[in-house]
Amino acid sequence: MITKKNFSLKNHNSFKIDVKAKEFIEINSKEELIKLNELLKNEKILFLGGGSNILFTKDYDGTVIHLNIKGINIEKENSDFSVVKANTGENWSDFIEFCLDNNLGGVENLSLIPGNVGSAPVQNIGAYGVELKDVFLSCEVFNTDDFSIKNFDLSDCKFEYRNSIFKKRK
């Protein structure tokens, strides 16, 4: 876990707007994420992935949590399907490239969508007739109410066109 005060977010948003966060915490593991409970009670928090779906107009007077948990691996593979696990901090295009490099088809229409893997379920990203829900099995979700990690399967996510349960919750 890396913590910085009065931190520029210029390199953490696609518009490259040079605003500052009162505090910036980079999370590099699931264990660090769970430890946030001890650090952030009653704090104003913004979770930030790749910064491609946010427009900062002024400094952020709170704590920005940058989820930088990396890792992509093939969990299961047979002649019918494959299961690939990708962590929240992975760049979406890098994830697609990993799949294509390993001859795992079905996701190629989703290439070059900006952002990180962790934000893909929020928007139910899609392009050229394919949506995330078409190739999605499950995701681990960090619950900010009790600082626990829960598993959401396809039906739990309530995917709709460019929408999911993650947009509808507080």
Task: Pin down the residues of each PLM region.
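Anion-binding (especially nucleotide phosphate/pyrophosphate-binding) glycine-rich loop
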Residues: 1-131, 135, 139, 143-145
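Long, positively charged amphipathic alpha-helical accessory segments at protein N-termini or as interdomain linkers
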Residues: 142, 149-170
